[in-house]
Each structure stands twice: as C-alpha cells, then as structure tokens.
C-alpha cells in the first residue's frame, strides 16, 4: 500500500491506455513488416487509425499500373525503359528504338532499379509484396547470361507477377509459362509448336 491507500500495482486509466496503444502499435508494426517492404511512419499511423482489416482492404482497392492506360502509373517495364533512357541516352534515344539489341550488360541493373522503386515507393505495397513472394515460387534467374542481358524480359516478368498478384492462379501460371523470361530460363524460347501426325 502507498501512503494514500492505493496499491502500488494498480493501474491508472492513463497507463492502461498507454499499454493498449503500445499493443496496437506493435500489432500494426508487425502487419507492416509482413505486408510491405518495411514499415513507414505514415503507414503505421494509417493502420492504427483505420485498423488492420481496413488497411488491407484499402491496399487491395488501390489502382495499379495494370488497371487502365493513361492513369500516370507506370509498369515495371515502362519504368525500366525510363531508367535505361536516363542511363544511356545515346543507346535508347527515342521511344521506337528496340531495347537490348546490343546486349549491354547493365540492363538487369535497370530492371532491379525499377523493381526497387516500386517495392519501396508504390502505394499498393501488398501487391508488390505478394508479387515478390510469387517470384520466390515461380523463379527466373538474372544469373543466366541471356536473362541478365535481357532486363526488359525480367521487368515484364515482374509485371506479370504484380498484375496477377490478386488474381486467378491459373491465369498467372499461363502468363508465366509464356513469358520471355521463363522461355529464356527454361530454354523453351523459340521451340516449334508440336505438330500432330494425324
């Protein structure tokens, strides 16, 4: 007992509120660790403000670069091309020139830069976190020389994963199987279609 008759271990409303607030912050932080590529203060505040379920619903409702043309959102492939033009203006001088004709070794660097830009700054963080998880399951490798020099195929592959992150798995597998990056990785690019003998 204290001199005023209260028990020392009795909690006041303010300390109880502080504990509850801390628990809410910890839960929000844990969600953001799992659903994003790193919690940011604005996201933490938003999760605490609207709750975990509402934040996830909000993330699923964000427009993406794959919804409509002319929305000022860029796909990974489009962003890759912007980076390549900035890095090598003489090689990629206009919008009509073909990318990677001369197989510069830096193209996978441009793809990585485009991917990191989306992963770190896109508002729809869950989309890119799911796409990253899919990339760990449906693997193509930039370590292979032909893939490393085709950063455009890797950027397009990233787009397939991000576009289908919340969609039908069968559609995802179909697009992955037909993608240039998977064709290079599995060495079925350029194979002739099967012709039945009947």
What is each residue range found by the language model?
Residues 1-113, 117-121, 125:
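N-terminal module-boundary/linker segments of secreted carbohydrate-active enzymes
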Residues 42-44, 48-49, 99-198:
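Primarily short, surface-exposed interaction patches in extracytoplasmic proteins
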